[in-house]
């Protein structure tokens, strides 16, 4: 009998090939990485009869050896262990190919039939086919993992055997009988099993439970190129890796002596995450003998089964005609009202999890992740991925990474703020404004405004200094570098996750055409240069025409936003005179603050109202383009929504930052809108306080509104759904799928709203951070709540979403990089244009006491306020007063040769502003590019490991095929060759 250990070394010895030192390695010298989810099935113990058969394939001897070697034995030439000590642990040894033949036999078992034959098979036959010395030895107590598997297998058909993979819901009173009947008939013809059951609480509701059997799973897994495990991993180690391994061992021992980090999850609380380490390859029925199939029921994970069923639902016809296809169209026309995979059970248990363990993965996620008491803990990303799929897992991984990276940004921003707070009373500018009791400012409006003392702006000056001080430039540069570091290290983190979750080559293999695209362009086909198969094609002229229409719609919506901002500007101009003559003394005294606050609230209401229209218009424009794949559709829709909402949120902020008070003219010659309303001016301390107010209010109100819509609204809806259930029906009597039906569905656009909210927040945190250094702190506090709020929503308030796969966060990464570039430009303009940093700098080194480069005995900014205010003759205003008032500008006095013309200092400041913008941008962009160059997207060790695994996969596929051919020759009585025939 030829025995194969499954390693490259033994294979090459049989082949007479040379073996390099790098290939002589044992897996025990390295800690295995946890990569392939389908291997998770191997760590479970299954139901009683099934565990009896599968336990035959594992020996205690092989378990003690290197984890890559798979020692299996032949069923036709079984060898009994003849030692007395193995009496209670008898094991059969078979070859790798024999196990594959056994698994093939399962799929061809005559007792395993389709739905018409009740879809049952006699598992007892599997046990009787083997040599078993003592049947009593298999009566073992189920372990914690056993119970977890049984509980996590999800709801079942009435026979208690077939797992429910998907749920369809419709109303009995709906008249779309023919469409449903045709659709369900076609589903059965495709190999799915259906079972109908009426709702308990609502007699009008009917549920269709869907189960996908083994043969259908295999067929579609091959069609979709789903990667499945076929061999345990072996690892490459060199001298450096071994020395590093020893160092890690020493560090691990030292770490064990130290106190445990309270943020780290207790791994013992997640027994289901102990995965075997396997190589994976595209599934093929012709090469099924290559794959590790310990049990058919768990070979394909719940997420994979749901994805395959959904793929079939999306491509099954319900009427004659190429476009009459897909469950989504049936939901849109009312034939069905919902389609979703079921949750694995209740998320709460009457028994404490510490003593009785988790009832299912949903319960475990709630207790260890979604509860508010776990806000300080790391996220169980592997379990999130296992339950919700890789796409949602990547979202929470990115959100957690973003939140963690906000900690240093928030700390530095808080330090800048406290620096301004502690030095506020020592600010020369604030002191001069607060002491200017004899300086009168010109009226800020035409009718109801009067002269104001400069010291009336004392509070504004001190508050402005909190955000406009010496640390502003440093913080702007820091945040630009922070954004680059955040994105570059996220790319590395993403590459590690995609490798760990076996997503390296997924996009190339599994991306399929959208049914709508296929139905629209089925008459125009071209040969795909990659696959060599014909597929529908969208002509270039048609694509360009649709894109032009879509772009026109985008510009129209952006114009609508700008129009709304213009309306708010007009409102500010109209009401500022009304507030200046208001009866309430507080509003009359602080009329500028009241005008800004009211405008911010109105602007926020307009933002929320326009958002309702944006989503529908973006949806229509995206469908008009007919994207080729689902990822293209999601990227196009996400880009439109981002452009709409970004302009909607930030247009008013851009107005305040770069236009407010810039084009007002001067006393006696003010610029007016429509020759009627005088343009708004900044108060003597500048416009930065208006920008801070606008950002703070919008950021705060929007976060509250988003949190309410994400959690409060679903809570109210779910409460109302439960309230409508008939009285006298206990929750325990309602099946899981009916409880899921009473939950709210995940929105139609998936994670788009979640990403959009965070990306817009990232824009707030970086684009105008020079004006609002507390933005990272507010974002951090919000995200700590956001993670648990989203977790609670996914686990308890939403139906289980389709466990979709993804390799990255999609178009959002490019948008984040674009925001990082825009942030450098806007912060340069905010510092140079909006703040008074450049005028103070020019005065300090050109016009102030320190201009002569002599060691001064007084502050270099002494006299700055008086220098920054120009004079105007009150007699020219027609107010019946004489003397002079002051206004913010650099113009000549009335007694000069060129009164009210710009002075030389104005042009010096303008040149300094432009020079600062150029120097700042080039310096920061250079630093960002250098950092991005230093940080590779994929760690070198991971890159080498991926290349090594590709090589080993080819070798192992060759070895497995050779084993299979040898087994076939042995059965047919032909001589066994150790090389290819």
Swiss-Prot record:
GO terms for cellular component: plasma membrane. It comes from the Eukaryota. It is a multi-pass membrane protein. Residues 1-403, 491-550, 614-640, 783-810, 936-981 are cytoplasmic. Residues 425-469, 572-592, 662-761, 832-914 are extracellular. InterPro entries: Anoct_dimer, Anoctamin, Anoctamin_TM. Residues 1-33 are annotated as: Disordered. Glycans are attached at residues 425, 448, 455, 866. The chain crosses the membrane at residues 404-424, 470-490, 551-571, 593-613, 641-661, 762-782, 811-831, 915-935. Residues 1-22 have a biased composition (Polar residues). Keywords: Cell membrane, Disease variant, Dystonia, Glycoprotein, Lipid transport, Membrane, Transmembrane, Transmembrane helix, Transport. Pfam families: Anoct_dimer (PF16178), Anoctamin (PF04547). One of its GO terms (biological process) is detection of mechanical stimulus. The keyword Transmembrane helix applies. It catalyses: a 1,2-diacyl-sn-glycero-3-phosphocholine(in) = a 1,2-diacyl-sn-glycero-3-phosphocholine(out); a beta-D-galactosyl-(1<->1')-N-acylsphing-4-enine(out) = a beta-D-galactosyl-(1<->1')-N-acylsphing-4-enine(in). Highly expressed in the forebrain striatum. The keyword Transit peptide does not apply. GO terms for molecular function: chloride channel activity; phospholipid scramblase activity; protein dimerization activity. It is found in: Cell membrane. Interacts with KCNT1/Slack. The term 'anoctamin' was coined because these channels are anion selective and have eight (OCT) transmembrane segments. There is some dissatisfaction in the field with the Ano nomenclature because it is not certain that all the members of this family are anion channels or have the 8-transmembrane topology. Belongs to the anoctamin family. Has calcium-dependent phospholipid scramblase activity; scrambles phosphatidylcholine and galactosylceramide. Seems to act as potassium channel regulator and may inhibit pain signaling; can facilitate KCNT1/Slack channel activity by promoting its full single-channel conductance at very low sodium concentrations and by increasing its sodium sensitivity. Does not exhibit calcium-activated chloride channel (CaCC) activity. It is linked to Dystonia 24: A form of dystonia, a disorder defined by the presence of sustained involuntary muscle contraction, often leading to abnormal postures. DYT24 is an autosomal dominant focal dystonia affecting the neck, laryngeal muscles, and muscles of the upper limbs. This is Anoctamin-3. It comes from Homo sapiens (Human). The gene is ANO3.
């Amino acid at each position: 009998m030829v025995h194969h250990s499954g390693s490259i070394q033994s294979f090459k010895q049989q082949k007479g090939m040379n073996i390099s030192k790098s290939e002589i390695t044992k897996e025990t010298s390295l800690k295995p990485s946890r990569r392939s989810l389908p291997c998770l099935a191997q760590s479970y113990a299954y139901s009683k009869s099934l565990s009896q058969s599968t336990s035959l394939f594992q020996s205690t001897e092989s378990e003690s050896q290197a984890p890559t070697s798979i020692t299996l034995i032949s069923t036709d030439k079984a060898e009994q262990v003849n030692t007395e000590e193995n009496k209670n642990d008898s094991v059969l040894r078979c070859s790798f190919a024999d196990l594959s033949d056994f698994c093939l036999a399962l799929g061809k078992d005559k007792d395993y039939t389709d739905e018409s034959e009740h879809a049952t098979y006699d598992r007892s036959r599997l046990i009787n086919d083997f040599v078993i010395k003592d049947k009593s030895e298999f009566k073992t107590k189920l372990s914690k993992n056993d119970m977890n598997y049984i509980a996590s297998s999800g709801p079942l058909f009435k026979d208690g055997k077939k797992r429910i993979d998907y749920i369809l819901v419709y109303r009995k009173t709906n008249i779309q009988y023919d469409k449903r009947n045709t659709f369900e008939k076609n589903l059965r013809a495709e190999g799915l099993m259906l079972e109908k059951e009426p709702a308990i609480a609502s007699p009008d509701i009917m549920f269709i439970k869907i189960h996908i059997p083994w043969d259908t799973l295999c067929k579609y897994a091959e069609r979709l190129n789903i990667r499945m495990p076929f061999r345990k991993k072996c690892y490459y180690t060199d001298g450096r890796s071994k020395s590093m391994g020893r160092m890690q061992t020493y560090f691990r021992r030292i770490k064990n002596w130290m106190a445990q980090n309270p943020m780290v999850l207790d791994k013992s609380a997640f027994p289901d995450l102990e995965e075997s380490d396997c190589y994976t390859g595209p599934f093929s029925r012709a090469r099924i003998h290559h794959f590790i199939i310990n049990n058919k029921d768990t070979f394909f994970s719940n997420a994979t089964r749901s994805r395959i069923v959904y793929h079939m639902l999306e491509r099954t016809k319900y009427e004659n005609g190429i476009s009459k296809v897909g469950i989504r169209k049936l939901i849109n026309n009312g034939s069905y009202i919902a389609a979703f995979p079921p949750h694995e059970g209740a998320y709460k248990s009457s028994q404490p999890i510490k003593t009785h363990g988790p009832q299912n993965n949903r319960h475990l996620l709630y207790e260890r992740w979604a509860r508010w008491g776990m806000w300080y803990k790391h996220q169980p990303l592997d379990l999130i991925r296992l339950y919700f799929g890789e796409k949602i897992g990547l979202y929470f991984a990115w959100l957690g990474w973003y939140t963690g990276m906000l900690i240093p940004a928030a700390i530095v921003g808080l330090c800048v703020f406290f620096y301004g707070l502690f030095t506020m009373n020592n600010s020369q500018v604030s002191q001069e404004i607060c002491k200017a009791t004899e300086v009168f400012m010109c009226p800020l409006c035409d009718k109801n405004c009067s002269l104001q003392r400069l010291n009336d702006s004392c509070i504004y000056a001190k508050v402005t200094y909190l955000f406009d001080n010496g640390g502003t430039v440093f913080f702007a540069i820091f945040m630009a570098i922070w954004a680059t570091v955040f994105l570059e290290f996220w790319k590395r983190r993403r590459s590690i996750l995609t490798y760990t979750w076996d997503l390296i080559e997924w996009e190339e293999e599994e991306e399929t055409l959208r049914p709508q695209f296929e139905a629209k362009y089925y008459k125009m086909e071209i040969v795909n240069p990659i696959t060599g198969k014909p597929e529908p094609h969208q002509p270039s002229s048609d694509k360009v025409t649709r894109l032009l229409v879509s772009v026109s719609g985008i510009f129209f919506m952006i114009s609508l936003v700008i129009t709304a901002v213009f309306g708010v500007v007009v409102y500010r101009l109209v009401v500022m005179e009304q507030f200046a003559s208001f009866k309430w003394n507080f509003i009359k005294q602080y009329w500028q603050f009241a005008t800004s606050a009211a405008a911010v609230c109105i602007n926020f209401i307009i933002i929320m109202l326009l958002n309702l229209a944006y989503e529908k218009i973006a949806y229509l424009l995206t469908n008009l383009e007919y994207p080729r794949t689902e990822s293209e559709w999601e990227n196009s829709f996400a880009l439109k929504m981002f452009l709409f909402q970004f302009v909607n949120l930030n247009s008013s902020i851009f107005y305040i930052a770069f236009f407010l008070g810039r084009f007002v003219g001067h006393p006696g010659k003010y610029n007016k809108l429509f020759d009627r309303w005088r343009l708004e001016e900044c108060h003597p301390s500048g416009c930065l306080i208006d920008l801070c107010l606008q950002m703070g209010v919008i950021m705060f109100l929007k976060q509250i509104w988003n949190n309410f819509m994400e959690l409060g609204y679903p809570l109210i809806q779910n409460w109302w759904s439960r309230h409508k259930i008939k009285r006298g029906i206990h929750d325990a009597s309602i099946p899981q799928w009916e409880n899921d039906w009473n939950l709210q569905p995940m929105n139609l656009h998936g994670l788009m709203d979640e990403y959009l909210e965070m990306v817009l927040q990232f824009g707030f945190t970086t684009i105008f951070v020079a004006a609002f250094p507390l933005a990272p702190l507010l974002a951090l506090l919000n995200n700590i709540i956001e993670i648990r709020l989203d977790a609670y929503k996914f686990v308890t308030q939403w139906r289980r979403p389709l466990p979709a796969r993804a390799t990255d966060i999609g178009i959002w990464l490019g948008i984040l990089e674009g925001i990082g570039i825009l942030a450098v430009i806007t912060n340069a303009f905010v510092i140079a244009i909006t703040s008074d940093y450049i005028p103070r700098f020019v005065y300090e080194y050109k016009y102030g006491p320190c201009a002569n480069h002599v060691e001064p005995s007084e502050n270099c900014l002494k006299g700055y306020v008086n220098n920054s205010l120009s004079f105007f003759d009150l007699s020219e205003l027609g107010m019946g007063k004489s003397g002079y008032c002051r206004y913010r500008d650099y113009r000549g006095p009335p007694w000069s040769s060129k009164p009210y013309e710009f002075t030389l200092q104005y042009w010096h400041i303008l040149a300094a502003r432009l020079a600062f913008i150029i120097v700042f941008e080039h310096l920061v962009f250079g630093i960002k590019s250098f950092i991005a160059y230093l940080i590779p997207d994929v760690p070198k060790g991971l890159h080498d490991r991926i290349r090594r695994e590709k090589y080993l996969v080819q070798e192992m596929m060759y070895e497995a095929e050779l084993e299979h051919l040898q087994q076939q020759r042995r059965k047919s009585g032909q001589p066994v060759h150790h090389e290819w025939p």
